[in-house]
């Protein structure tokens, strides 16, 4: 009797193709806001990102989805996680990746962002990833270039790919996003992460709470469709996910908190406060963390409850999904 051949090993790359075949085109040529996505589009994007997670865990991590395309990273603010993950994402998809630093650009010589955009557009990059200290910078750039622009953070406005990776982390931990309660805690006022997460989590069916001191809460935040809490323990009571935010001292021009010690006492996440959340609650932080200010190390480093390292891994997969989807749209339009 002839022995049966062993089953072919699972190839994560093959799981990507059918998703790409049914993938939506982005509602716009650019990805500037988490609000650009409706629920089916967001779900498709998470499905694609999920396939890239499996792909990234194999030994060979090379695809040709962006072969012949040029990805340019324009980071006018410091970044470790976001810039590195976009660079890795682009290279794994086969793109030529160019990193531009403001320290070596003509911006230091007085060139405006618009002039920079016009100059870069003459080089015909296909995809431009932009981080800038000014709200609306990515939108402005998108009006001046022929390639697709991805907002990697514009001032206090938005950080849409962070919201995608956060939603992916939550979905992988719970198997769903819809019906969950997510408490976003801390410096909401200065947080582009909070704004993008509120938009995407609502789209995916989650209930969102904002928790923080009155001095760090946007005026009329309830208009975002959230509940606002100034008491940390009450705000995270029964929450499935507790998402901590970095205290952005560099964006503060006054005394928003008495001291970091006092801030941790009332709004830093420790075991005692976390006990108020749901029994199987998960903890998140977009990074970089200020340990002992926003979150206790004992909580941040506990693999049973913390998704913080998962968020870093999901960042590459989520950004691969965004880049691949935009490339799909470029092909549809013959670019």
Swiss-Prot record:
What is this protein's function per UniProt?
Catalyzes the condensation of carbamoyl phosphate and aspartate to form carbamoyl aspartate and inorganic phosphate, the committed step in the de novo pyrimidine nucleotide biosynthesis pathway.
UniProt-listed InterPro entries: Asp/Orn_carbamoyltranf_P-bd, Asp/Orn_carbamoylTrfase, Asp/Orn_carbamoylTrfase_sf, Asp_carbamoyltransf, Asp_carbamoyltransf_Asp/Orn-bd
Enzyme Commission number, as recorded:
2.1.3.2
The protein depicted here goes by the name Aspartate carbamoyltransferase catalytic subunit
One of the record's GO cellular component terms: cytosol
Pathway field of the UniProt record reads: Pyrimidine metabolism; UMP biosynthesis via de novo pathway; (S)-dihydroorotate from bicarbonate: step 2/3
Which amino acids does the record list as binding carbamoyl phosphate? 81-82, 131, 159, 162, 287-288
The family note in this entry says:
Belongs to the aspartate/ornithine carbamoyltransferase superfamily. ATCase family.
Q: Which GO terms describe its molecular function?
A: amino acid binding; aspartate carbamoyltransferase activity
Lineage runs: Bacteria, Pseudomonadati, Pseudomonadota, Alphaproteobacteria, Caulobacterales
Q: For binding L-aspartate, which residues are annotated in this chain's numbering?
A: 109, 192, 246
Coiled coil ranges (UniProt) are: none
Q: Which reaction does it catalyse?
A: carbamoyl phosphate + L-aspartate = N-carbamoyl-L-aspartate + phosphate + H(+)
What Pfam families does the record tag this protein with? OTCace, OTCace_N
| Source superkingdom | Bacteria
Q: How does it assemble?
A: Heterododecamer (2C3:3R2) of six catalytic PyrB chains organized as two trimers (C3), and six regulatory PyrI chains organized as three dimers (R2).
Q: Name one GO biological process term.
A: amino acid metabolic process
Keyword Zinc recorded: no
Per UniProt, the keywords (alphabetical) are: Pyrimidine biosynthesis, Transferase
Gene that encodes the chain: pyrB
